[in-house]
Amino acid sequence: MGRFIFVSFGLLVVFLSLRGTGAGFCCPLRWSSYEGHCYLVVKEKKTWDDAEKFCTEQRKGGHLVSVHSREEADFLVHLAYPILDLSLIWMGLSNMWNDCKREWSDGTKLDFKAWAKTSDCLIGKTDGDNQWLNMDCSKKHYFVCKFKL
């Protein structure tokens, strides 16, 4: 019996020590994984700034979602639609025309675009057409957070 407890304790220590290293490549509870990143659909409306702050507080490296391919955009729609139905979600671009900024809030390059119009802050539609629209940053919308595993 003592040996069983010792082995069980040892396995628990190993599991806990590996948990923070990315060894399991698993996303936290309520987060979904895609291509080495974790995504969280948040069904609480916030301004762009408050949504970005919320995402950065959830996980180290967390930000509003950045999208780098049509496949990732499709994944995002399939993830968000069942939770948010036909909604608009904040994405990680803001003040891009005022500051001539061409990167996502997570610092990654803007290498995939699906513009509908120019904007101060960027929202995406969850209805499957993957269009991005302009929106006043002070409006409140649902959002998706993302971080790299």
From Swiss-Prot:
Database matches in InterPro entries: C-type_lectin-like (IPR001304), C-type_lectin-like/link_sf (IPR016186), C-type_lectin/snaclec_domain (IPR050111), C-type_lectin_CS (IPR018378), CTDL_fold (IPR016187)
UniProt entry keywords in alphabetical sequence: Disulfide bond, Hemostasis impairing toxin, Platelet aggregation activating toxin, Secreted, Signal, Toxin
Family the entry assigns: Belongs to the snaclec family.
Signal peptide (UniProt feature, chain positions): 1-23
Domain C-type lectin: residue ranges: 34-146
PANTHER family the record matches: MANNOSE, PHOSPHOLIPASE, LECTIN RECEPTOR RELATED
Tissue: Expressed by the venom gland.
Organism for this UniProt entry: Deinagkistrodon acutus (Hundred-pace snake)
Localization per record: Secreted
Name this protein carries in UniProt: Snaclec agglucetin subunit beta-2
Subunit structure comment from the entry: Heterotetramer of the subunits alpha-1, alpha-2, beta-1 and beta-2; disulfide-linked.
A cellular-component GO term for this protein: extracellular region
A GO term for molecular function: toxin activity
Protein function: Agglucetin specifically causes platelet aggregation and surface exposure of integrin alpha-IIb/beta-3 with a GPIb-(GP1BA-) dependent manner in washed platelets. It binds to human platelets in a saturable manner, and its binding is specifically blocked by anti-GP Ib mAb. It regulates endothelial cell survival and promotes angiogenesis by activating integrin alpha-v/beta-3 signaling through FAK/phosphatidylinositol 3-kinase (PI3K)/Akt pathway.
Intrachain disulfide bonds: 27-38, 55-145, 121-137
